[in-house]
Amino acid sequence: MVIGLLKTLVGSRNDRLLKQYRKVIAKVSAFEPSLQSLDDVALATKTAEFKLRLAAGESLDDIAAEAFAVVREASVRVMKMRHFDAQIMGGLALHQGKIAEMGTGEGKTLTATLPVYLNALTGKGVHVVTVNDYLAQRDAEWMSKLYNFLGMKVGVNLSQMDHTTKQAAYAADITYGTNNEFGFDYLRDNMVQDLDQRVQRGLAYAIVDEVDSILIDEARTPLIISGQAEDHTDLYIKINALPSHLERQIGEEKADGTGVEKPGDYWVDEKSQQVYLTERGHDKAEAVLVQLGALNDGDSLYAPQNITLMHHVFAALRAHTLYLRDQHYVVQNGEVIIVDEFTGRLMQGRRWSDGLHQAVEAKEGVQIQNENQTLATITFQNYFRMYGKLAGMTGTADTEAYEFKEIYNLETVVIPPNRISQRKDKQDQIFKSSRERYDAVIKDIEDCYERGQPVLVGTTSIENSELIAQLLDKRKLPHQVLNAKQHAREAEIIAQAGRPKMITIATNMAGRGTDIVLGGNVGKQSSLIDADSSLSDAEKASKIMQLQDEWQSIHDQVLASGGLHIIGTERHESRRIDNQLRGRSGRQGDPGSSRFYLSLDDPLLRIFAGDRLRAVMERLKMPDGEPIEAGIVTRSIESAQRKVEGRNFDIRKQLLEYDDVANDQRKETYRLRNEVLESSDIGDLIANLREDVLRAVCSVYVPLESMEEQWDLAGLENVLASEWGLTIVLKNWVEGADSVDDSEIVDRVLQLAKESYDAKVDLSGRESFASFERSVLLYSLDSHWREHLAALDYLRQGIHLRGYAQKDPKQEYRREAFELYGELLNVIKNDVVKSIMTVQIRSASELDQASESMNDDLAKLADVQYQHADPDMEVAGSTGDRGAAIDIQPAPLCAGPKVGRNDPCPCGSGKKYKNCCGALT
């Protein structure tokens, strides 16, 4: 009550921001008359003028109003479109590094041109991030006319582009691309062997379109570059037979022994998307595995040597119980292709990790591809947090505003629409069974068809969309289906979806990127006609002219019928996804309507509210086919959705807390790698490493400040000769000297090592040897970093068990990960020094061949796969929504601020940098 009163008196934070923006809009409008009087050349030269003003000390905020006015005027001349005041407000929010929530049809693509142009004036580059290649290319081509008019270069970063083209795209003032490409480019840039191989040039400013989809929905699925690992094809085939021998338990056993409706060998936790063996299931699984030849008789499934086998068992169970064909994946041309849960699109070339994809391939009887080893990985959360300034646009962000602020420090600003929406959102209708629900859906579609109203039916899976299509076929109602199997016709189907009597069935993929225009999208339909090679030029012109003449009457007809009607056949776990479906209707003040038809069989209701609602229906003695339609029921469903959203937020936050540990180590490792790449000669670094390593070796046999009786000189001589390539006589020298202390022995060893090193340099030449040293260090760093990533992954999978010992798993993970990183640095130091000291050199050409060989080995990593990990395997013991596989690529390196020797180490150990990660340098 008090908060509400304060908001009434002083306005909400959103209201105050909009008030500030309106003041800037007045300034933008004030520039308009003078800019209108300029010719095209004079208007375009404003770009050079702005750059000079920035160089003279003015800030972007100082020139923002005039720059926005220039873009608005240029848009009028080039695009024949003038930015609305709402778009100016959205542009200001984006420039300030906030999320602008703007409804469907409000022109987010045009809005972005304002802050993109302004921030591109700095010359540091602006990244415009979209969800797929089609939108990236479309928006770049569409808006490049405006940017080119103003003297800005535009690049497009698409998958499968060659190296030179990518470099050119990143060198442009403005670069459009997908979140996947930007992320994978970052990782690839940190795997290069030469500075010239990098493509990115910095992470200054990014605007993320459909920011909720990228930073929320895909946040839990790390980007992974992986290479071939050990082949376990036969094992997958054997274990695929196991689930058919096991019975599913119905109900979870509680602490008091109740809860099990039907005993079985395993039970499925649908909330956490995990499968667990029961006590009887363990015994039965072991017996079956022995019969299958996968387990030795008498061995336990939990024996240390069978950890990998256990991993395969659970992967097979999850593949058979949780991952469904035509819902989570499709099988095409003998391949298992993942369906993106959030967009409904096929994820060509993307694979689930941790053996899950191979388990699904075994289940479907298709060829099993080899497993992969992680070479580099990062989450979207940590990638996008590296940008100097980050902003985003979407039509549905307010429900996730807390998470955006908590994780990314991004404030959400709700921009008022240019025209108030007239869409009517009707109460949900809930039925006892799916059959009754679909009967009601078909009846609603028939009613709309009879009055000429276009309908968009939203489904959550390919299977459901095809079921509705079959029901409509029986009623002889014409319709279009848009799902991952028909994605190639997406543009054509969406262009027609707003025409009278059109029935469009779509999975979530129809929800983003393209507006449904009432009466049909004339521009899109015209381009489709123009692309039809079967028509002559005269026929094309005639059809396009006819289309334009008919459009207004068709548009008016659709308006009179009530606009686009949205039918949702199921509630999604997230309210935001439901709002996206609703948002397809009522664009720019158009009329429209929406309604969700639900069933007690739906996963959301079954898991969170099914029993309670079923009891209500039975008490009310509701007849078959009669729905519940009440505000209190709709609110209870939204309450269940909020619970799921809260749980998923906790999981994403937990993932981030774990990944932050690896992220600190990743940044430090990449920083070290960059120093090596950027240094013309790392001789001083090698000398420091050599001294550190040999001092440590000597201290084992000749402890510091020890007595002569404690020395093992013979052992030191042997180890230096056998492992470090140094032949030295210490025992006779010590016996013949009057007095020798431990420091003199160390100095003698170091001096001999330096002489040996100098001799190799003299023989090969400084330039050749410097190249060899760089290759050795990069090879060791990259190979051991890959092993370290695997070690961190294994550590994370089991760390939750520390909770049973009353220890904080996250703190334990941080501590042990730091210890592993310390071991990594020591191994790298020893590896590098040993390689350089033991190399036998006969000529400079031999040394060059050795360098090329190591570089070739690393270059083989270019034959890699890009994937998202399955998030349910990312944090063992966690619960969460199912993740999707996704396509991605890498960006440039951010070296970050230089760390002083006495500053706290950025890896989080609490030690000084010089005593921790800085020890390597």
From Swiss-Prot:
InterPro entries for the chain: Helicase_ATP-bd, Helicase_C-like, P-loop_NTPase, SEC_C_motif, SecA, SecA_CS, SecA_DEAD, SecA_motor_DEAD
GO cellular component, one term: plasma membrane
Cofactor note: May bind 1 zinc ion per subunit.
Record EC number: 7.4.2.8
Predominant place of localization: membrane
Catalysed reactions, semicolon-separated: ATP + H2O + cellular proteinSide 1 = ADP + phosphate + cellular proteinSide 2
Name this polypeptide is given: Protein translocase subunit SecA
